[in-house]
């Protein structure tokens, strides 16, 4: 009987160790509201995740229109990574955390830089004020 209890305990222990974290659901559109590394610089960023595809609209303080970058992304547990349409990888793999109410997404880069996004639909004032989609490797200043 004692051996059976030890055996059952061992099975339960191994089963508990085998559980993995579920993927963070980043589906939807997000607006950058805060970034730890930007002090005084103004940047406006919108990100939309749909299926495994993403679109990123970004505009710096000196720009009058948004640049748009398309690509694909994947989520593995709490890690998110991606590639742009030209095949180049994002600058980092990010740790993704969503608030309990699902309205805030926090991405933490390997460098420790933290970006906070609020769930919001990308407005037409952004999508209609966009330079042609950036798809080549010569575009500078990609957000992710």
Residue ranges of model-derived segments:
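Short, solvent-exposed coil/turn segments at beta-strand boundaries
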Residues: 26-27, 46-55, 75-79, 95-105, ...
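Beta-strand residues in well-ordered beta-sheet regions across diverse protein folds
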Residues: 33, 57, 83, 106-108
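Sec-dependent bacterial lipoprotein signal peptides
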Residues: 1-16
């Amino acid at each position: 009987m004692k051996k059976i209890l030890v055996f059952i305990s061992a099975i339960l222990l191994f089963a508990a160790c085998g559980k993995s974290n579920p993927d963070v659901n980043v589906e939807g559109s997000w607006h950058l509201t805060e970034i730890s590394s930007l002090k005084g610089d103004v940047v406006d960023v919108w990100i939309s995740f749909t299926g495994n595809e993403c679109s990123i609209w970004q505009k710096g303080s000196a720009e009058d229109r948004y640049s748009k970058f398309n690509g694909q992304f994947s989520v593995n547990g709490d890690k998110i990574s991606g590639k742009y349409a030209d095949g180049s990888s994002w600058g980092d793999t990010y740790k993704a955390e969503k608030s309990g109410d699902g309205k805030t997404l926090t991405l933490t880069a390997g460098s420790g830089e933290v970006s906070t996004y609020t769930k919001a639909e990308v407005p037409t004032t952004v999508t209609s004020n966009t330079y042609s989609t950036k798809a080549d490797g010569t575009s500078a200043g990609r957000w992710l």
